[in-house]
Amino acid sequence: MAEKHGSLSINSENIFPIIKKWLYSDHDIFARELISNGCDAITKLKKLDVMGEYTLPDDYKAEVQVIVNPEEKTLKFIDTGLGMTADEVEEYITQIAFSGATEFLSKYKDKTTDDQIIGHFGLGFYSAFMVADEVHIDTLSYKEGAAPVHWTCDGGTEYDMQEGNKTTVGTEITLFLNDESTEFSNEYRMREIIEKYCSFMPVNIYLSKENAPQEYETIDEAELRDDDVIVERIHEDAKTEEKENDKGEKEVVEVSPAKDKVKINKRPVSLSDPEPLWMKHPNSCTDEEYKEFYRKVFMDYKEPLFWIHLNMDYPFNLKGILYFPKINTEYDSIEGTIKLYNNQVFIADNIKEVIPEFLLLLKGVIDCPDLPLNVSRSALQNDGFVKKISEYITKKVADKLTGMCKTDRESYEKYWDDISPFIKYGCIKDSKFSDKMNDYILFKNIDGKYLTLKDCIEENRKPEDETKTEETVESTEEKKEDGAKDEKEPEKTTIFYVTDEVQQSQYINMFREAKKDAVILKHNIDSAFISHLEQKDQTIQFKRIDADLTEELRGEEAADEETSKTLTEVFRDALKNDKLEVKVENLKNEKVAAMMTLSEESRRMQDMMKMYNMYGMDPSMFGGQETLVLNAKHPLVQFIADNKDSEKTPVICEELYDLAMLSHKQLSPEEMTRFVQRSNEILLMLTK
């Protein structure tokens, strides 16, 4: 072919600086684009073979080689695809590929940094100029009689094309890296990039260093493959040892048979898995394969609890695997990773515009070839197709969880402590998910039994509630007909909960003795979750176990008013707090001398203050302080009432107050110091 010198149709000097500006944080995507081009070329060649338009050689290998050369600062991408003729190079490289880059640029020019293009797909071949001063292409088409082509361009407006010397079908792209991009001639850096973007591309990808010393390995001759390069044949004689037999006689025994081995050039190891687990049918995958895939992709050696294999072909193509990771404690941060792929090519992690936000607490991969890529994040948010994908994923997750609860309740309960933060967050964020999961949310009670929300309501409903149900309905209907306005709200069913089983053990024991139940809610998300449930069903309310005294904890007789007045004055004087709230009750549990209560409204307001770092503000501004509840039946309380002028009384009051507070919340460092010192003083008093 005649040598040709040509000009690109558009001034590339204006394009490449802008491309580099937009992709400065993702400039490693050039490798993904060039490897993807090679994979596409291989796929097309294999398709031609299937169609009978080309016959692949018997020794054909579908592969992309990436070769680094740090000394020369070059990087090569070699594929065994269908190659190009001179006319095709002219068409695809200087026209179509360039117009693709131009179209790519047009999508970016009006975008802000807050509205990035998803995945940066479509730049293709011209992404090479992000890192290279000069690019060479050597290619040979599969077409009979085609001549090899050599094409060069320095990123400016002109290119040169002439006949090349490539002898095998395929394409080789050589990048002469610029000074800012020499990192990409480092073998370890390129391995990192390939593993990031191309770990699951549908062809084998090999990475090597040019002019590196040849490495070797030794294998059994039986393991020899046709493509192995034999360096040396090795015969190992049988190994023997002299041993004593049963008769005490020494004899020579063979401990290892003779072996024929071969020394071969070290086999290259593919950096990609052309058949990732998510592309297989779920019925053909074993539990061990799922676990191994999880370890490999997420570098997490704690086994996942369980997983969901997504496999849908209509109305859109979507495959993937979602894993529920094990969380060690309620204090673990829940940081999931959902990797999004397009035709086995990695796009990005955790794209919340495609994947429901609450699912990002899980770990998994989702591959959706139908997903629009060259669009902005804001466009995805309003894309009806993407919304359907999101809804489908949510439905499959809900179906898996509800199905497990119905058919394998034992496993569901076993996993609950780990999966509950995810489910609760999902219910808060997604109303449809909440509706599906409403009957399958579990609460562990103080005896370790798991209850549904319906169970909790039934256990805590007052006996008279059931008898009044029909009357309430009739009364409501009558009032509606009469146009009555000031209706009294029906009494809510209260579900009590515990946030710290150790600290609140005194309250738990009181509840057990009174045959009252409470559920354990100690995760950070539980506060928001119970608020969500209360908004959804306004006939229920949640109260912490120390929020109030229930009727079941009180005795039948009310405390003496005069005694109550005396004790209030004594405690306020002893604690030097004239605003202290004191309530005297006859508690059924005579072992409890004092306890603290704080209304649920005040607690939640204080929790909100902590959440928003509103420290230093007086909690009483937002709903009041704790109330000290004294048990009039307890001997210590009776002693204080009868001996208000004793010198021991102030010390006993202070000690009782701190003991009650310890069962309610942590003391401050200063309060704890005073408590320990006072306790020591009381012990000394006992020795005298």
Feature annotation, model-predicted:
Residues 117, 135-158, 178-182, 188-688:
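GHKL/Bergerat-fold ATPase module in large chromosome/replication-associated machines
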Residues 1-179, 183-185, 192, 199, ...:
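GHKL (Bergerat-fold) ATPase N-terminal catalytic module, capturing the glycine-rich phosphate-binding loop
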